[in-house]
């Protein structure tokens, strides 16, 4: 990526660098082209490997979730299937029994069978016997029914002389068929009645605001921001950042947050700054991202208070603008207030060891060795101290 040096952008940077009574503000707007150079290609490969590792971690997590869901289904399916088999159909036995007795009543009052009818209708005892068997052994819930009962039910349907009864039994059979297919599929494990399996596709995994992270365009956009941070802060390496360290923003949010910060610092927003940036970036065609990690790398910088960092990406013009504003605590001691103010400043900003050492050098400190009166009669000639006149007078006496 290549840095674009423009005079009007330099004026923007100078305007956004100032000091207040409590902090020093460092801001600016740097624009880069997305045309890669040799160092960028190496960075792109490093980022690709990093993103692949993130995808593998995500797939491993999803696989663990899938396995947990399958275990839950296996633990709950037998109970569900047993409850389905043990659960009596509320109206099935009664309805089937009433239907069978209704068929028998209609058959008893119907005309006698003709000579050319099938042997099935000639044997009234056979019909009664089959009806009694079906009544004594009603149709069971699908998955628990026996073949003999199913055959008997089919025999009754064939012998039915009522169209209404036939439609009723056909609807019941269709409902039973649907239940059988659902329970059978649950037993085979093709579809879980308890929990749905969460499906994930590698091609649609979104990690951060850049879209599907497996796509080249999404990875390149992420790499552009990493490359700009590396160029702006050469003492740090940002290749290990995650896409989730960035959030997608909008032009309105960016302008509002920036101008509110400027007003809080005692300055008035200036419209020409946005006009200058727009002339180089076409903000209407830009996508906005904000660097918003849990822990900022600037927290290790001495005196760092807060920082705001945005990126404006214009795919058409192949440009990325880095727009930032940071606040640092003022390092210089106050120039007013005399020695008392300086002492308070040094006491509050120096290390405890240095403060203790400085205090020991004062006369009033309790640990100094110079106690009592001071002898100021020492001469520079090395002859020793000058005797007191009072002592000479006493000797003379």
Curated annotation (Swiss-Prot):
This is Repressor of RNA polymerase III transcription MAF1. Belongs to the MAF1 family. GO terms for molecular function: RNA polymerase III core binding. Mediator of diverse signals that repress RNA polymerase III transcription. Inhibits the de novo assembly of TFIIIB onto DNA. It comes from Eremothecium gossypii (strain ATCC 10895 / CBS 109.51 / FGSC 9923 / NRRL Y-1056) (Yeast). InterPro entries: Maf1, Maf1_sf. Keywords: Nucleus, Repressor, Transcription, Transcription regulation. It is found in: Nucleus. One of its GO terms (biological process) is negative regulation of transcription by RNA polymerase III. Residues 385-397 have a biased composition (Acidic residues). GO terms for cellular component: cytoplasm; nucleolus; nucleus. Pfam families: Maf1 (PF09174). Residues 120-129, 159-174, 181-191 have a biased composition (Polar residues). The keyword Cell division does not apply. The keyword Repressor applies. Its main location: nucleus. Residues 72-195, 374-397 are annotated as: Disordered.
């Amino acid at each position: 990526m290549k840095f674009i040096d423009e005079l009007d952008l330099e004026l923007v940077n100078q305007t956004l660098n100032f000091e207040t009574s409590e902090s020093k503000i460092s801001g600016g707007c740097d624009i880069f082209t997305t045309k890669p150079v040799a160092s960028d290609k190496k960075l792109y490969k490093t980022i690709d490997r990093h993103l692949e590792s993130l995808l593998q971690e995500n797939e491993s997590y999803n696989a663990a979730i899938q396995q947990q869901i399958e275990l839950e289904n296996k633990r709950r399916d037998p109970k569900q299937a047993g409850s389905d088999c043990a659960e009596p159909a509320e109206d099935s036995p009664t309805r089937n029994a009433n239907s069978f007795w209704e068929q028998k009543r209609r058959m008893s009052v119907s005309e006698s069978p003709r000579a050319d009818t099938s042997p099935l209708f000639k044997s009234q005892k056979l019909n009664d016997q089959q009806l009694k068997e079906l009544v004594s052994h009603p149709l069971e819930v699908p998955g628990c029914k026996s073949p003999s009962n199913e055959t008997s039910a089919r025999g009754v349907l064939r012998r039915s002389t009522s169209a209404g009864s036939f439609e009723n039994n056909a609807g019941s059979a269709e409902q039973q068929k649907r239940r059988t297919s659902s329970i059978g599929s649950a037993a085979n494990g093709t579809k879980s009645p308890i929990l749905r399996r969460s499906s994930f596709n590698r091609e649609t995994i979104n990690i951060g605001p850049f879209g599907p992270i497996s796509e080249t365009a999404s990875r390149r956009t992420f790499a552009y921001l990493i490359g700009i941070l590396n160029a702006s802060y050469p003492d740090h390496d940002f290749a290990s950042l995650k896409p989730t360290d960035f959030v997608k923003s909008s032009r309105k949010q960016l302008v509002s947050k920036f101008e509110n910060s400027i007003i809080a610092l005692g300055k008035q927003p200036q419209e020409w700054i946005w006009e200058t940036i727009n002339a180089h970036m076409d903000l209407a065609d830009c996508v906005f991202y904000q660097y918003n990690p849990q822990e900022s790398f600037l927290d290790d910088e001495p005196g760092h208070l807060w920082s705001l960092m945005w990126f404006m990406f214009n795919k058409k013009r192949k440009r990325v603008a880095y727009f930032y504003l940071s606040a640092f605590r003022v390092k210089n001691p106050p120039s007013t207030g005399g020695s008392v103010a300086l002492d308070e400043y040094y006491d509050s900003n120096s290390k405890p060891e240095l403060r203790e050492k400085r205090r020991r050098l004062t006369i009033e400190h309790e640990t100094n060795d110079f106690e009592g009166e001071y002898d100021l009669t020492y001469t520079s000639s090395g002859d020793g101290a000058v005797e007191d006149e009072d002592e000479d007078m006493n000797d003379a006496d």
